Regions:
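Rossmann-like dinucleotide-binding cores of NAD(P)H-dependent redox enzymes
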Residues: 1-28, 112-116, 134-142, 147
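Generic secondary-structure signature for well-ordered alpha-helical cores
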Residues: 14, 18-19, 31, 70, ...
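A general beta-strand register signal
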Residues: 21, 40-41, 77, 144, ...
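FAD-site-proximal beta/loop scaffold in flavoenzymes
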Residues: 32-40, 45-125, 211, 217
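Cysteine/selenocysteine-centered motifs that mediate thiol-based redox chemistry or coordinate metal-sulfur cofactors
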Residues: 209-240
Length: 240
């Protein structure tokens, strides 16, 4: 999320009884036998608890890949199109593999189901002698918190020259579209997900927006896509 949308989500969660302790980490837990009763924060404050969930991000388990002599950074380095590793006979896909974000070229772990599926299909095809490749990977997420629908995609915190955005905000909704070089490269949608599919397709397809008829914020439509793309989407992705 960006800063404004994060504040909206936080306010909504606090309304439902959640409390935030920002900028703090848990330094230790106080237990009675095997039961956690309290945790101590970095600032010395103690919080009672019935259940302690530890969640500080994910890191791929790469010990096997390293033992096999594969090139590993934060994850296993692969060809982003074929998923071939530094060993030509070994392929990697999914959360263990470093992805290349198609929108800015950065290398990162994109531990998301759609990316894992695309990479797995490409790796399987390549190992079987086929030529299927990964079309491109990027971040996309959708979640619901107590009825607050949140969708994000692409470069939502991009900064620097060449990036612009459009924002529409209300008390319980938020829409932000991020642009670069005349194309949509990211969005944040909160209680405004009606056109999420079209926005995602505009991003993944790299569709130029110049000269398009209609308001992108309120009324994007399939006629903005090339004819062959429109036909495929209307047929549910099946080529007839």
């Amino acid at each position: 999320l960006d800063e404004k949308s994060a504040k909206l989500v936080r306010r909504h969660l606090e309304h439902h009884g959640l409390r935030f302790h920002l900028g703090q980490t848990v330094t230790r837990a106080k237990c009675s036998g095997k039961t956690v009763q309290r945790v101590v924060l970095q600032n010395g404050k103690e919080l009672p608890c019935d259940l302690l969930v530890v969640a500080v991000g994910v890191r791929p388990a790469t010990a096997l890949a390293e033992a096999a002599g594969l090139t590993v950074e934060r994850g296993i380095i692969t060809d982003p199109a074929t998923m071939q590793t530094s060993d030509p006979d070994i392929y990697a896909a999914g959360d263990c593999a470093v992805s290349v974000d198609m929108l800015d070229g950065s290398k990162k772990i994109l531990a998301l189901w759609p990316n894992a599926v695309a990479q797995g299909r490409a790796a399987g095809s390549q190992m079987a002698g086929g030529d299927l490749t990964v079309g491109g990977t990027y971040a996309v997420n959708a979640i619901d918190f107590y009825g607050l629908r949140i969708c994000t995609c692409g470069l939502i915190n991009a900064k620097g020259d060449g990036y612009t955005d459009r924002v529409a905000a209300a008390d319980d909704s938020y829409k932000r579209l991020v642009f670069r070089d005349g194309k949509l490269v990211g969005y944040v949608l909160i209680n405004a997900s009606e056109n999420a599919g079209i926005y995602t397709s505009l991003i993944s397809g790299g569709v130029p927006l110049e000269g398009l008829q209609g308001d992108l914020m309120d009324s994007p439509n399939l006629f903005w896509f090339p004819k062959e793309t429109r036909i495929t989407k209307l047929r549910g992705g099946v080529q007839l």
